[in-house]
Structures are given as structure tokens and as C-alpha cells.
Amino acid sequence: MNRFFLPILSLIVCSSFLNADKKASLKFHDPVSKDVEGWTIKVDPRLLESDNAELGKACFTALANHLQRIKYILPKEKVAELQKLPIALDLEHRLGNMQYHPARGWLMANRHDPRLEKHVHIPRAKALINRHTWAKHPYVVLHELAHAYHDQVLSFNNKEIIAAFDNMKSKGIYEKVLLYTGNKVRHYALSNHKEYFAESTEAYLGVNDFYPFTRAELKEHDPMMYRVMVKVWGEVR
């Protein structure tokens, strides 16, 4: 046997055991399902413990506020579709920002619970009652639900949304816009057509942190996307 082979074999075996041990050590809590305004919320059980009772109550109240503002402006059939999209609420996750998880592969590659696939995720409950979050992103939950709706109901390959995105890029109308702070910046919607749809949804149904801030401004500034919004969400009067 080659004298170099045994040390190499030992390294391979040790590495295999380490990787197996690492995978075995990945343990995730089993969430508790709660109903908030008709949505299924997969709740970190720590939020329901007595030590976190006050925080949990405040967060559920804030989340209900977010969902009510969606529920009362949309047609009932749209609300029913959105209520099929689950939300995961964690006490303190190593992820920071609220987000939507479209793919299991990314979750597993980054050592997150694969059960978060196709969920809107609120990694840190305190974000729901944070003053800065309310000042900057008063419709952040709607934004993430819009991603879920885009993926699961419309499809990320929706041609009308992609066409509107390409149109606005070609016109350069989002290159320098007003931010909620008063500064002029490049619009976050330019990131990709998915963010464009979610940002436009915020403006159409609520208030966005980038111009166009409101439905009327979206209609004036980006009429093609405004028409997409009317088609997707229905007229708002």
C-alpha cells in the first residue's frame, strides 16, 4: 500500500464524520400554528413562553395591524389567495431582515430550516414593533407577501411583470428618485423584476419608502406598471 494513502484515507474518514456530525447537530424548533387575521402564522414556541409573553402579545398585535391593512383594501377573493401563503415568525433568528424563501436549496445550503420554503419569514419578532421599521417600511409584510404571491400564484416568469420591468429600465425613470428620508437615490425596484413587483405593490396598496410612494404617483410615474397592478390586485377606489 502506498505510504501516503493511509494518512489521506484517515483525513477523508475524519472529514466524513465531522460533516455527518454537523448535519446531525442541525436542530430546529417545531413551530406552533396560530391564526392571525385568517393567515396561518408558524410561531417560534419561545414567543409563547411566559418570559416573552409581553413581547409576543405586542408582536401579534402589530402583525394583525399589517394584515388588516391588506385585508380591508383588497377584494375578498384576493385576500383569500393571500391567506393561503404562510408566515413564519421567529423570536431571534440569525437571519435579520424580513424575507420570502422561494427555494429549499438555498435554505439547506445556508443551514436554515428547510420547512421555511414558500414561507414569508419574520426572523426577529422585535422588528414588528421597531420604530425605524414603521418609519421606513410600514408595508414590509405586504412587500414579502407580494413576493410569495408573485411566486406561488402569478409565477416569477409572468411576462407582463417582466415586460413592465424592462420598459421602466429602458426609460430610466427609477434611476434617481426621492427616498422617504428626502434624499435622491437609485430605486430598489431596479434590483430585479421581483423587487419591482413587490415595491409597486407597496405603492399601489399602501405607502412605499421610494418614489412613487402612493397609488396616484405610481399611475403618473409608471403607467405601464400601474396597469399591471390593477390587473393583479383589482381597482382600488
Spans of features found by a protein language model:
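Sec-dependent N-terminal signal peptides
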Residues: 4-13
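Bacterial Sec-dependent signal peptides at the C-terminal "C-region" and cleavage site
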Residues: 14-25
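A domain-start/cap signature at the N-terminus of enzymes
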Residues: 28-29, 33
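Acidic/histidine-rich, surface-exposed loop or edge segments in extracytoplasmic proteins
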Residues: 34-57
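Structural recognition of the beta-strand scaffold that forms the well-ordered cores
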Residues: 42, 86-88, 121, 148, ...
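Acidic/His-rich structured neighborhood in mature extracellular/periplasmic domains
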Residues: 57-170, 213, 225-226
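Metalloprotease/metallohydrolase-associated module, dominated by Zn2+-dependent proteases
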Residues: 109-117, 127, 131, 135, ...
